[in-house]
Swiss-Prot record:
This is Testis-specific chromodomain protein Y 2. It is found in: Nucleus. GO terms for molecular function: histone acetyltransferase activity; transcription corepressor activity. It is an enzyme of class 2 (transferase). It comes from the Eukaryota. CDD domains: CD_CDY, crotonase-like. Gene3D superfamilies: 2-enoyl-CoA Hydratase, Chain A, domain 1, 2.40.50.40, Lyase 2-enoyl-coa Hydratase, Chain A, domain 2. May have histone acetyltransferase activity. Residues 72-104 are annotated as: Disordered. Testis specific.
Amino acid sequence: MASQEFEVEAIVDKRQDKNGNTQYLVRWKGYDKQDDTWEPEQHLMNCEKCVHDFNRRQTEKQKKLTWTTTSRIFSNNARRRTSRSTKANYSKNSPKTPVTDKHHRSKNCKLFAASKNVRRKAASTLSDTKNMEIINSTIETLAPDSPFDHKKTVSGFQKLEKLDPIAADQQDTVVFKVTEGKLLRDPLSHPGAEQTGIQNKTQMHPLMSQMSGSVTASMATGSATRKGIVVLIDPLAANGTTDMHTSVPRVKGGQRNITDDSRGQPFIKKMHFTIRLTESAITYRDIVVKKEDGFTQIVLSTRSTEKNALNTEVIKEMVNALNSAAADDSKLVLFSAAGSVFCCGLDFGYFVRHLRNDRNTASLEMVDTIKNFVNTFIQFKKPIVVSVNGPAIGLGASILPLCDLVWANEKAWFQTPYTTFGQSPDGCSSITFPKMMGKASANEMLIAGRKLTAREACAKGLVSQVFLTGTFTQEVMIQIKELASYNAIVLEECKALVRCNIKLELEQANERECEVLRKIWSSAQGIESMLKYVENKIDEF
């Protein structure tokens, strides 16, 4: 959201990047906490009240913490002074007892040693208690949105069955505490488990009882994340801070690139240390699927590519999500994207790397993936609504005419610079663009690579509605929910009537475009053109 204006609900956290610039973790209105993003201070010029309120709360919290620390120090010093004065008075006032024999001396030594042991045990108990408090404050288990049901227990473990993802979204974060190897609260406990207050006395994994000290992020990764057994995260070890909302480590020039330490690949936003055990999180890596009342929302949020670019893995996930939505009870599909970019088209860096190894095989595989992707849109029976929140480039723009409604943020823009890419048009744009905006405008976009603003795209028919940035999300959700209230059969029949005359034409255009792409990608000149673009491309975001 670096280049757009969205409505801010609250400021959640604050930090400084490596250059000393202040950044704020922003909770966006209309979005969940997993969509929080770090924004530079200059992006929040219109949100001075939210920033002021956050800074005021932080100042009050710091003052309270300072006062508490000072009170503890004063109390400890006073306790030490009292102890010293008591010892001094006792040593002055107490009479010296003469020791007459060895038996009496050995008895006194034993009593003295016993008293020292008692004091040592008491001190160690206090130290252990303090250490456990620290562990309890750092070890948290996050299991929101768990789609699992807990019905049968076999050898101390629960059999996990999926629930409705909508109901799972309503669950709260569960905090585990570990005390001397015993789990006090387990989200997988049987519903009939005995409870004391808010704590459940349940069995735990036998290996978990052997764990001591802090639980690191690597340990959490190996603790059955996708199976839903137990997930322990130490935020200090994972993030370097105690805040669980660490998202984008550094923001530079409006660009959100995060490095996934486990894979060494950059990806855009949305890497919170919150484990969401939803159906979408388990099934997909680069998209998020939300089952809403009457519609399915597919959010493009790529982790394997930058700026929501499309490679074969991302495309296959989108096709699988569309096929699932076609078979479920949803009436329509809402396509949207996370971050400040809707979609920047194909990931040419990925394509060049694969084409260098075996041009013929790789080009055929990529072309088949794109052909299947476009045909899925052409043959999809339910209405598809697209919410374009930012720039749509290449295939991200050419796919829009195959959808039924396209709602754009006024900050969005559209471009299909295929000649700059070193490739030919895709997504049936060779036929949909001329039909939609005329040959002259289509050539301007497909050959000359002209960039259209949201208003211009709406005037040419590429976009159906343009909304203000501040109310974009709210307007989209209001209208999509209204559409979802209509009769499902009527919606499908309306789309079928509109598409019946051009469906075959679109499939033939897709076949021709993919054949040309295969020829270009299997040639040395085609790979050289793409490589040149990748090396010389300018970041416009």
